[in-house]
Amino acid sequence: MRVVDCVGALIRDEQHRVYVQRRTAERRLFPGIWDIVGGHLEPGETPEQALVREVEEETGWKVRDIVWSVADWEWEYEGRVRRELDYLITVDGDLSRPRLEAGKHDASAWVGPDDLELLMVNRTDGDLRLRDLVAHAVRTRFTDRLRLEPITGPNGVLPGQVADLVSVYADPWVATWYDAAAWTPDDVARQAAGYQAGWERDSVSKWIAYEGGALAGRGGLSRVSAESPVAAAITDLVGAEWAVDRLELGWALVESARGRGLAGEIGRAGLDFAFNTLGARAVIALTERVNTASQAVMQRIGMTYAGEITAEGWAEGMKEIRPDAPFAVYITGPQA
């Protein structure tokens, strides 16, 4: 593998926004585009040392914590290939007053979920890789024990989570509940693409969950299609306020991650995202009546039993999925 040429700093604030700055129009490399903090390694520097130096030179801030190594990728400009490492970090300093490096940057901004297209301004080549990298950092969440990354397919910077999603659905317990035993890697890849499309279309979708370096499962939020029978049944049960956002919360953990409270961490992260990032009015979770373990998690994270609907799933005493299985529905609002 090539030696590391440059580093990038995905500086994130308490609102999960990422700091970007605009390169001056006079710059030879990528003039006029919005970029993250970063630059080339100097002789003898490690990537981490270069990161600390670049952050202070370009913003005046001090690196507090290198949270996570997000990406290791290569890009080409004017025939030269460069290897870049990008890190999610936090900093100390006045985040409202960065010290822009004279002659190099002329504006700054904090990018949240609704601001991602700023990364495409003046980007005449249509290259989405930096935009997608920032989106990944903005959408990632951390709990006490988990890192929750938005599920995507390969996107030119990140490898995506298809292989890990295949492992989740290969777990016998997960495969049973999701009727996934016969799914192929191509089936799972299509599902990952669907999750990625959900992030772009709905500003929310599923995460893949890691405990340290170990795969724990997947979970998060989905917007239930307004045209689906399930949406109509839920609306009839819980009321029209839920139908404004149509958010459903769920999780699926591999065997090594079950029974240790991790589903609750995913659930609470999903509720926080729904209410504090999206401004949602209500969130539901539903599972088959026979899945008492998931219902217990719903109760522990503060959701209230609302009643039952019928949908395709498992029912007590049945050996096959049926179209009218009873599902327990739980609901909560932002003040719950």
Task: Give the residues covered by each predicted segment.
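Conserved N-terminal beta-strand and adjoining loop/helix that marks the start
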Residues: 1-18, 213
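Acidic pyrophosphate-coordinating catalytic loop
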Residues: 2, 26-29, 72-85, 316-322
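Conserved Nudix-box catalytic region and its N-terminal flanking loop in Nudix hydrolases
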Residues: 17-57
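A structural microfeature
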Residues: 20, 68-71, 217, 307
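Unchanged
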Residues: 41-65, 73-125
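Charged phosphate-binding loop/patch that engages nucleotide di/tri-phosphates or the phosphate backbone
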Residues: 125-139
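Acyl-donor (CoA/ACP) binding surface of acyl/acetyltransferases
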Residues: 139-176, 206, 210-336
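Conserved GNAT-fold acetyl-CoA-binding loop/helix
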Residues: 173-194, 205-207
